Amino acid sequence: MPQTLHVHSRVKDYDILFTDHVLKTLADCLGERKQRKLLFITDQTVYHLYQTLFEEFAQQYNAFVHVCPPGGQSKSLERVSAIYDQLIAENFSKKDMIITIGGGVVGDLGGFVAATYYRGIPYIQIPTTLLSQVDSSIGGKVGVHFKGLTNMIGSIYPPEAIIISTIFLETLPQREFSCGISEMLKIGFIHDKPLFQQLRDFQKETDKQGLERLIYQSISNKKRIVEQDEFENGLRMSLNFGHTLGHAIESLCHHDFYHHGEAIAIGMVVDAKLAVSKGLLPKEDLDSLLQVFERYQLPTSLERADVSATSLFDVFKTDKKNSEQHIIFILPTETGFTTLAINKDDHQFVEKLDSLL
């Protein structure tokens, strides 16, 4: 497996580096910046699991640490403000750097701070969950939630580099591992059927090298899509399969009941059911999706009686993918994907949605 993937970006090119030696790879990435101030942003879970790693950072660099509570509620303007306070207190300049080390929440949060502090300072991502390694760290999207709405404030701001190490996955709980698989299945279902089939048959306990290949294959797929459509005007929209409903579920559950990959799994099932109902997708493909989700213990239906189709529809109206008058869903097809535009006043769709949940 190649050690590096180079990503072309209209904003700034960057490398994805695969390694078992995080400290050395980070040192190589920093180069002359080793002498600059570095703010490591992480969460309490990662900080306690890898305290010796942070001690190494403190010995080698002019390092500061910001530790967030774990979970989606840290993706907030309040947390951004707290990090700004620390950067200002430590007199960080435009030449200093942020390094995120954690899952998707930490990466999105730290990247947003980097994009906005002094109108942009450099940052490096070290994703520690499967989901962040294969999905959220790739493509430059950064942002935070606002008033409960998912990823309402953000930008596209690529990092200097992304450091991928499967060593971090050795301490990853099964629930988080399955959430990463959810995003890998998403890209496989639409763009790479062999990847989907390999994930369906994968045996985590006995095939570490197989996992590394699947991660590389997933990242390569996303890299290809992002390079063709960085600002999500066409092909990259396909990566929102499951996300219109998934993000609404996360918002209504306050970003703590379902993890991201779980909410997206429910969204993918509903999108696939819509596609089947419109004759766009064979029923056998939906059945295959349901089977593999069940194998990885991912939810396939909404388990919250307090979240109604009506309340979900109201949240859909704030989705960033929408056009002026329409809510946009991404539907899988036999050969790829298509978009479904639902009028924001189409209350009949609420009844349809209720039957699919």
Curated annotation (Swiss-Prot):
<keyword id="KW-0170">Cobalt</keyword>
<feature type="binding site">
    <location>
        <position position="183"/>
    </location>
    <ligand>
        <name>Zn(2+)</name>
    </ligand>
</feature>
<dbReference type="InterPro" id="IPR016037">
    <property type="entry name" value="DHQ_synth_AroB"/>
</dbReference>
<dbReference type="GO" id="GO:0000166">
    <property type="term" value="F:nucleotide binding"/>
</dbReference>
<dbReference type="InterPro" id="IPR030960">
    <property type="entry name" value="DHQS/DOIS_N"/>
</dbReference>
<feature type="binding site">
    <location>
        <position position="243"/>
    </location>
    <ligand>
        <name>Zn(2+)</name>
    </ligand>
</feature>
<comment type="function">
    <text>Catalyzes the conversion of 3-deoxy-D-arabino-heptulosonate 7-phosphate (DAHP) to dehydroquinate (DHQ).</text>
</comment>
<dbReference type="Pfam" id="PF24621">
    <property type="entry name" value="DHQS_C"/>
</dbReference>
<dbReference type="GO" id="GO:0008652">
    <property type="term" value="P:amino acid biosynthetic process"/>
</dbReference>
<keyword id="KW-0520">NAD</keyword>
<dbReference type="GO" id="GO:0009073">
    <property type="term" value="P:aromatic amino acid family biosynthetic process"/>
</dbReference>
<feature type="binding site">
    <location>
        <position position="260"/>
    </location>
    <ligand>
        <name>Zn(2+)</name>
    </ligand>
</feature>
<dbReference type="InterPro" id="IPR030963">
    <property type="entry name" value="DHQ_synth_fam"/>
</dbReference>
<comment type="pathway">
    <text>Metabolic intermediate biosynthesis; chorismate biosynthesis; chorismate from D-erythrose 4-phosphate and phosphoenolpyruvate: step 2/7.</text>
</comment>
<feature type="binding site">
    <location>
        <begin position="104"/>
        <end position="108"/>
    </location>
    <ligand>
        <name>NAD(+)</name>
    </ligand>
</feature>
<dbReference type="InterPro" id="IPR056179">
    <property type="entry name" value="DHQS_C"/>
</dbReference>
<keyword id="KW-0963">Cytoplasm</keyword>
<dbReference type="Pfam" id="PF01761">
    <property type="entry name" value="DHQ_synthase"/>
</dbReference>
<dbReference type="GO" id="GO:0046872">
    <property type="term" value="F:metal ion binding"/>
</dbReference>
<protein>
    <recommendedName>
        <fullName>3-dehydroquinate synthase</fullName>
        <ecNumber>4.2.3.4</ecNumber>
    </recommendedName>
</protein>
<keyword id="KW-0479">Metal-binding</keyword>
<feature type="binding site">
    <location>
        <begin position="128"/>
        <end position="129"/>
    </location>
    <ligand>
        <name>NAD(+)</name>
    </ligand>
</feature>
<keyword id="KW-0456">Lyase</keyword>
<feature type="binding site">
    <location>
        <position position="141"/>
    </location>
    <ligand>
        <name>NAD(+)</name>
    </ligand>
</feature>
<dbReference type="GO" id="GO:0009423">
    <property type="term" value="P:chorismate biosynthetic process"/>
</dbReference>
<feature type="binding site">
    <location>
        <begin position="168"/>
        <end position="171"/>
    </location>
    <ligand>
        <name>NAD(+)</name>
    </ligand>
</feature>
<comment type="similarity">
    <text>Belongs to the sugar phosphate cyclases superfamily. Dehydroquinate synthase family.</text>
</comment>
<dbReference type="InterPro" id="IPR050071">
    <property type="entry name" value="Dehydroquinate_synthase"/>
</dbReference>
<keyword id="KW-0862">Zinc</keyword>
<dbReference type="GO" id="GO:0003856">
    <property type="term" value="F:3-dehydroquinate synthase activity"/>
</dbReference>
<keyword id="KW-0057">Aromatic amino acid biosynthesis</keyword>
<keyword id="KW-0028">Amino-acid biosynthesis</keyword>
<keyword id="KW-0547">Nucleotide-binding</keyword>
<dbReference type="GO" id="GO:0005737">
    <property type="term" value="C:cytoplasm"/>
</dbReference>
